[in-house]
């Protein structure tokens, strides 16, 4: 029985440290709220209630949220739906950047 457990463990594909990091950041990303407003000149401003741990991803999350609003998402539910649809793309870009920086 113990040998079977070790055999199964050996057959499992190894998860890279980058993939582990993406999973952790993805979980954090799902718990972040963005607050968007406009300054006195009518420019959009964005702030996050916490960080994903990656400043570039945080910036992209704000840009994505603003883009959703500019594209017509009105109300929290519509904005959330729009942003959630873009999160896989944000994480894919982060994954490429992390792989590139560690090669």
Task: State the predicted function of each range.
Residues 14-103:
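Post-signal/leader-peptide non-cytosolic segments of secretory proteins
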């Amino acid at each position: 029985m113990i040998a079977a457990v070790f055999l199964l463990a050996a057959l499992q594909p190894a998860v890279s440290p980058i993939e582990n990091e993406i999973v952790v950041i993805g979980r954090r990303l799902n718990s972040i709220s963005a607050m968007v407003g406009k300054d006195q000149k009518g420019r959009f401003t964005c702030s996050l209630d916490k960080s994903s741990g990656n400043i570039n991803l945080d910036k992209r999350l704000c840009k994505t949220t603003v883009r959703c609003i500019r594209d017509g998402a009105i109300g929290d539910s519509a904005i959330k739906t729009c942003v959630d649809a873009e999160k896989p793309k944000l994480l894919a870009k982060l994954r490429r950047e992390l792989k590139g920086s560690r090669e």
